From Swiss-Prot:
The keyword Nucleotide-binding does not apply. It is found in: Cytoplasm. NCBIfam families: PRK01683.1. This is Trans-aconitate 2-methyltransferase. Keywords: Cytoplasm, Methyltransferase, S-adenosyl-L-methionine, Transferase. Catalyzes the S-adenosylmethionine monomethyl esterification of trans-aconitate.
Amino acid sequence: MQDWDPDLYRQFEAERTRPATDLLAHITITSPQFISDLGCGPGNSTELLHRRFPDAQLVGIDHSQAMLASAQQRLPHCTFVEADIHQWHPSQPQNLIYANASLQWLTDHPHLFPSLLSQLAPKGVLAVQMPDNLDQPSHRAMREVAENGPWQQTLQEAGATRAKVLSANHYYDLLAPHAERVDIWRTTYYHPMPSAQAIVDWLRATGLRPYLAPLTEAMQLAFLQNYLAIIDKAYPARTDGRRLLAFPRLFIVAHAQR
C-alpha cells in the first residue's frame, strides 16, 4: 500500500485532534518520565502530549516515513521512530502508552492489548482511542462499491485490512485481570461537513486507502465517483446545507497495577 499522505490527513486536523484531546483529558497521572505515542501520524497527538508533559522523554512511533517526516518538521525537538507497533518493545517500562486512532489498523487485539499493558511501569497508563465506524454508512458504502464494479476481484481483500473493533466487554476482560482500573466509554461525534465531497475527502486519507491503493488512477476516479453518489444519499443536507457525519469512537484507559 502507498504511504500515508500527511497533507491530505491534515485537511481535517481539528476534527481528528478533538478525540485525542478528549482522551488526554482522562489521563490523570502527573510527571510521567517515559511516554510513547503509538501511531503518532503527523504529530498532532504528540504535540498535545508535549504540551501537557514538557519534561517527559516522549517518543512518537509510526510506520509511515511520510508521517514521521511531517511530525519531525512540526516538532523538531521531539524524537520520532519508525517501527511496527506489533514488533515495538521500549527499552524501559513506560509511564504512558498513548494510541490515538492507530490500533484499529492492527490485528490480534487479544494479544496486543495485554502485551502493551505489560510494558507499563507500575501505576502507568495505557490510553487508547479507536474509530468504531465500520458499520456506519460511510464504511458500508465502501464495501458496496467494492463489490459492484470492474475492481471486484482486485478489492476482494480490501475490507479485511482493518478488523472490526471488539466489544467494550471484550476489551475489559482482556485488561482487567492485569490492571488496577479500566475505564471504557464510547462517544459519537457529529461533524458538520460542508458537502458530501468533504466526507469523501476526509475518508480518502484513512478508511478509503485500502480500496484505492490497488487501483489504477482511472479506476480510483471511477470508484470515488460511485462512492460519492452513495454518500450524497446517505448523508442528506441538513437545514443549513451541511452534512452531519456521525463518527463513533471507543476509548480505553487502563491503569497498571502498583
